């Protein structure tokens, strides 16, 4: 909600303008966070019926860069189907993303299935963005396998 090209700010004037817009137009408070310019992932979490273990299925989400060179999944990008979804290659990065997703899911009390969104900084350090413990299962809009 309210995420657009003006969401990444570089000074207090831009910050004040964006926060005021959110308050005035959407009647919501602003959550201000550091912009993470690395890759973004959506990780489906499923509990195996056979083993009972949690399994993680990450996909990488990317979108066209805006005029400032930032990439974000804004409402406009999603509504125009401009995001790209690709599999995550095997390796340490995938293992790290899957571990963070499963740990986050457990910490939030997730039981059977859910989706965890993660974004990395420039150095590749992964950060929890949000959880959807009742994710949409519609393939086109749900980012769930």
Q: What do the predicted segments below correspond to?
A:
Residues 1, 27-28, 80, 105, ...:
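Short, functionally important structural connectors and interaction interfaces within domains
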Residues 4, 40, 137-138:
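Gly/Ser/Thr-rich beta-alpha loop segments that engage phosphate groups in nucleotides
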Residues 9, 36, 137:
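Hydrophobic pocket-lining residues within nucleotide cofactor-binding pockets
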Residues 91-145:
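ATP-dependent carboxylate activation and anion-phosphoryl transfer catalytic cores
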Residues 1-8:
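A conserved helix-loop-beta module that forms one wall/lid of the active-site cleft
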Residues 2, 83-86, 140-142:
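Short small-residue beta-strand/loop micro-motif enriched in glycine and branched aliphatics
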Residues 12-92, 99, 120-127:
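Phosphate-binding site of ATP-dependent enzymes
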């Amino acid at each position: 909600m309210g995420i657009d090209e003006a969401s990444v700010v570089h000074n207090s004037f831009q910050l004040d303008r964006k926060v005021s817009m959110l308050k005035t137009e959407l009647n919501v408070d602003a959550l201000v966070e550091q912009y993470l310019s690395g890759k973004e992932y959506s990780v489906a979490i499923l509990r195996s019926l056979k083993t009972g273990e949690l399994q993680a299925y990450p996909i990488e989400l990317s979108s066209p860069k805006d005029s400032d060179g930032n990439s974000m999944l804004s409402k406009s990008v999603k509504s125009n189907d401009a995001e790209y979804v690709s599999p995550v290659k095997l390796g340490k990065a995938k293992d790290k993303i899957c571990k963070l997703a499963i740990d986050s899911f457990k910490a939030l009390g997730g039981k059977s299935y859910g989706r965890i969104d993660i974004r990395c900084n420039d150095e590749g350090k992964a950060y929890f963005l949000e959880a959807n413990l009742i994710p949409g299962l519609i393939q086109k809009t749900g980012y769930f396998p």
